[in-house]
Amino acid sequence: MDEGPLTNWNVQIRKGLLELCILNALLPGRQYGYDIVKQLRDIDGLMIGEGTIYPILSRFRTQGQVEATIEESTEGPARKYYRLTPLGKKCLSEMNQAWDRIHLGVLKLRGDAT
């Protein structure tokens, strides 16, 4: 594969997984936006900027998957915290199941499944 197709493939994979990763980052409980970014930056190959997640979080709010609350901070301006709604948890569960099926299928194709 030359650089063009591989680069395009990597971009498409990251776009597809970003929503799944954002929702999974919110599963333990409410998160400040920047904390989500820091968690996602720890995922090798994801490569995201701070501005990347906020439009997605906004769309999740519109769709009812995420709620946001603004809280005063002693460390500067007020912060917006995000958390999953019951609908968001249901969607995440279904997305994780779909990802697990796809991932297992790819592993089987590669001969890596046990």
Can you annotate each of these PLM segments?
Residues 64:
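Glycine-centered, phosphate/nucleic-acid-interacting loop/turn motifs that mediate DNA/RNA or nucleotide
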Residues 59:
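Alpha-helical DNA-recognition elements
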Residues 68:
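Short beta-strand "wing" residues that participate in macromolecule-binding interfaces
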Residues 74-96:
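Basic, amphipathic "hinge/linker" alpha-helix immediately C-terminal to the N-terminal HTH DNA-binding motif
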Residues 1-17, 78, 95, 105:
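Intrinsically disordered, low-complexity serine/threonine- and proline-rich regulatory segments
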Residues 3, 90-114:
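Amphipathic alpha-helical dimerization/coiled-coil segments
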Residues 10-54, 71:
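N-terminal helix-turn-helix DNA-binding core of bacterial DNA-binding proteins
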